[in-house]
Regions:
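Auxiliary Fe-S-binding modules of radical SAM enzymes
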Residues: 98-205
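Core AdoMet radical
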Residues: 1-76, 87-97, 126-130
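A short, acidic, amphipathic alpha-helical segment used as a generic capping/interface helix at domain edges
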Residues: 44-48, 73-77, 102-107, 117-119
């Protein structure tokens, strides 16, 4: 049986969450916590169970809307992988709103570098962010800034995201996203991974 579950905070339920995950495993359900899990709440016991769950699309979803959540996601991913999980991770990533261009770019680019490391090392467990442009709840008709649309267009197309860094992405004729980095005073990598070869070089924390 396939189950799409909309609870975005099941791990906050403590022992009840443990019971539900154990039932899911015992009954062989294939599940998707569609609204994402909270990586901050993943402990050793949860990690062990999450690694055993049969996931729809072989994918676990987390949220990564701030720089601080990068550490939380990395910790949760390492714990779950430590129990034998070999599937993918899908990270909802809000861009815009309280996060300016620089913060949004550096947070998403962190996962681009991270995913590049995983792919070039032939390791399991690809990590894909999913960029969600901020929508003002008080003004739903407010136009989304062009940079948010372009960043989402780059991030959310896996076939492009896997092989093209943001500065080389061309969302339309005669425009390359390198222009955004110049505009916001961010150093442009010379070619792909020449200047940034590992996540340790991204001083994001």
């Amino acid at each position: 049986m396939n189950l799409v579950l909309m609870d975005n905070n099941i791990l906050a339920a403590g022992d009840y969450a443990i019971e539900q995950l154990e039932k899911i495993i015992e009954r062989g359900y294939r599940v998707d916590f569609n609204q994402a899990l909270d990586a901050r709440l993943v402990n050793d016991r949860f990690a062990r169970l999450l690694a055993k769950v049969k996931w729809l699309q072989n994918r676990i979803r987390f949220g990564c809307d701030t720089h601080s959540q990068i550490k939380d996601c990395e910790r949760a991913i390492a714990m779950i992988n430590g129990y034998g999980y070999r599937g993918e991770y899908f990270l909802y990533t809000m861009i815009g709103g309280k996060s300016d261009f620089k913060e949004s770019y550096e947070r998403v680019h962190y996962w681009w570098v991270r995913n590049h490391e995983i792919r070039t090392s032939h390791l399991p467990g690809a990590i894909y962010p999913y960029a969600q442009p901020y929508r003002n709840p008080d003004n739903p008709n407010e136009e989304i800034p062009r940079w948010q649309k372009d960043m989402a267009g780059w991030v959310n197309k896996h076939q492009i995201f896997e092989i093209t860094d943001f500065h080389n992405f061309k969302p339309r004729k005669n425009f390359r996203c390198e222009a955004y980095l110049h505009h916001y005073g961010i150093e442009v990598p010379q070619t792909g991974m020449e200047k940034v070869t590992s996540v340790e070089q991204l001083t994001l924390f």
